[in-house]
Design a protein with these regions (language model features):
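Core catalytic alpha/beta fold that binds nucleotide/phospho-ligands
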Residues: 1-196
Length: 196
C-alpha cells in the first residue's frame, strides 16, 4: 500500500506512516536497499521504514542518503544529523523527522499482553490510575518508548513520568529533568505516540 498518512506536528517536523501490504520482493524492489536481516517481517519493516523516511525527507526538503547510528544506537540522517525516530509494528512502519531537536516516536498494537509487563514500566501512581485497562496501559507503554528514544541512553522506564493527559490525546511527561509534550493517536488498533 505504501504511505497512508503524512503530517507535520510542527513546522520543522514530519511523520510518515507506511502500511505494509507489499511482498518482501516488492519492498526490496522499491527500496533498492541491501540488508542482511534474516527475519522476513523485520526485513519488510526495514524497507518500509526507509521508504517512509524518504517520503518525510522529501516533505522537509532534505536529501535522503541513508541513516547512521550514534554510539548509543540512536539513528540520524547521514547527510546532516537531522534527528529521526523510527518505529514499526507489522504491518506499520512509522518515522518522525525533526530539523531542530531530538524527537521520539513509537507504535504499539493494543494487546492484553501489555498487562503482563506493566509492573516493569509503570510507577505506582500510573499503575493505580491505569488499573486493568489494556488501552491505557498500551498508551503509557508507547509514550515511554517514544520518550526513551529521545534520550538515546538507557533509562529506567519507571523513571519516565507521565502526568495525566492535558487533553484527550496530549500528555505532559518528564524524563531526566526534561519536560516533553507527547501526542497520542490511534490507528487500526495501534497506538502511536510522538513528541510535539
Amino acid at each position: 500500500m505504501g504511505i497512508i498518512k503524512t503530517f507535520s506536528p510542527s513546522s520543522n517536523s514530519v511523520i510518515s506512516i507506511w502500511k505494509i501490504e507489499e511482498s518482501l520482493d516488492e519492498l526490496r524492489d522499491i527500496s533498492k536497499q541491501i540488508t542482511d536481516i534474516k527475519n522476513e517481517i523485520k526485513e519488510m519493516e526495514y524497507h518500509a521504514s526507509r521508504e517512509a523516511l524518504k517520503n518525510g525527507c522529501k516533505k522537509l526538503g532534505i536529501d535522503f542518503i541513508g541513516i547512521e547510528k550514534d554510539s548509543n544506537g540512536k539513528p540520524y540522517l547521514k547527510n546532516n544529523r537531522t534527528e529521526i525516530s523510527i518505529s514499526h509494528k507489522f504491518p506499520y512502519a512509522v518515522v518522525m523527522i525533526h530539523k531542530e531537536r531530538a524527537c521520539g516516536l513509537d507504535i504499539e498494537r493494543i494487546d492484553k499482553k501489555v498487562l503482563k509487563i506493566k509492573d516493569k514500566f509503570l510507577n505506582d501512581d500510573e499503575a493505580d490510575y491505569i488499573g486493568e485497562s489494556v488501552k491505557n496501559a498500551t498508551i503509557y507503554w508507547t509514550i515511554k518508548e517514544a520518550l526513551y528514544k529521545i534520550e538515546g541512553e538507557p533509562v529506567a522506564f519507571k523513571k519516565i513520568i507521565i502526568k495525566r493527559s492535558t487533553s484527550k490525546n496530549q500528555f505532559e511527561c518528564r524524563i531526566n529533568r526534561k519536560n516533553y509534550t507527547i501526542e497520542v493517536d490511534e490507528l487500526d488498533k495501534h497506538i502511536i505516540a510522538y513528541t510535539n
